[in-house]
Amino acid sequence: VTSNLYESKEYSDIREVIKDGINRYPDCVAFTIKNKEGKDIQYTDITYAEFEKEINSLGTGLLKLGLKDKKIAIIGPNSYEWVLSYISVLFGIGIVVPLDKGLPAQEIEDSIIRSDADALIFDPKYIDIIEDIKQRSTTKVKEFICMKEVESKEINNIPKIKKIGKEELDKGNKEFFELKIEPEKTSIILFTSGTTSLS
């Protein structure tokens, strides 16, 4: 009898899983991004190899901001920037805290406080809520990072951080590549759908 089973492969962490996919399919499309401006719609493909470069740039940039071993919350609808941020943090930077995109403003603030987040990466649609939270200084967040470019001196953004990271990589900075992932160490804090600020 001929076996149709595939040979399994064991991984020790999420970084190995992602890296394996990148090495196997570097030129294959990993993401297709839909860009809409008015009635004009364009699609941009990102290969696995390009995704790896983006992870390395963002990860190195986040480390340059002093976020090693810090808690980094992320909020926003499904997007390439959300996935990029999430994976970059899981590559050994610190603890990722994904927040429900449907939370009301007060619950967003409460979740940030409860998770003790040091940084917050957010979609532009939350800019008003985030600026309000920032003004009140109720959280310990030191880095507010928008997923897109914004006109604000007080709020950072992913394109800017990726640029800083790439410059560091070009200088030979290997800190991001040398990060160790400890299997028993907390890497994610999840709030379930039933979690409230009081539970």
Language model regions located:
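Conserved S/T- and glycine-rich ATP-binding loop of Class I adenylate-forming
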Residues: 72, 89, 120, 186, ...
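Flexible, non-catalytic linker and terminal segments flanking ANL/adenylate-forming cores
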Residues: 1-16, 34-35
